Amino acid sequence: MRLILWLPVLVVVLLMVLEGPAPAQGAPDIAGTFRNIPNSLKEFGNNLKDAFESIPEATRKLMTSFAEGLKNFRIPMV
């Protein structure tokens, strides 16, 4: 009985092994990777520049809201 249950499993495993690697698992194209490095670095630099340019505005908004909160703060009288 066990042999009958294991035969389909064995067939599926053998088919998977004999099929070979999937295209996503194939060897990467090293030359293409090296060609894409400058574009990736430029995109990273642009993203970093945008992030740093938004820091002063975000800080200004945070400080303004904090100052408004302090203006409206009342100490309760007991």
Swiss-Prot record:
Database matches in InterPro entries: ApoC-I
Domain of life assignment: Eukaryota
Signal peptide (residue range): 1-26
GO cellular component terms given for this protein: high-density lipoprotein particle; very-low-density lipoprotein particle
Localization per Swiss-Prot or TrEMBL: Secreted
GO biological process terms, semicolon-separated: lipid transport; lipoprotein metabolic process; negative regulation of cholesterol transport; negative regulation of lipid catabolic process; negative regulation of very-low-density lipoprotein particle clearance; triglyceride metabolic process; very-low-density lipoprotein particle clearance
Keywords: Lipid transport, Secreted, Signal, Transport, VLDL
Record GO terms (molecular function): fatty acid binding; phospholipase inhibitor activity
Keyword Transport listed: yes
Family per record: Belongs to the apolipoprotein C1 family.
Record function comment: Inhibitor of lipoprotein binding to the low density lipoprotein (LDL) receptor, LDL receptor-related protein, and very low density lipoprotein (VLDL) receptor. Associates with high density lipoproteins (HDL) and the triacylglycerol-rich lipoproteins in the plasma and makes up about 10% of the protein of the VLDL and 2% of that of HDL. Appears to interfere directly with fatty acid uptake and is also the major plasma inhibitor of cholesteryl ester transfer protein (CETP). Binds free fatty acids and reduces their intracellular esterification.
Name of this chain's protein: Apolipoprotein C-I
Organism of origin: Puma concolor
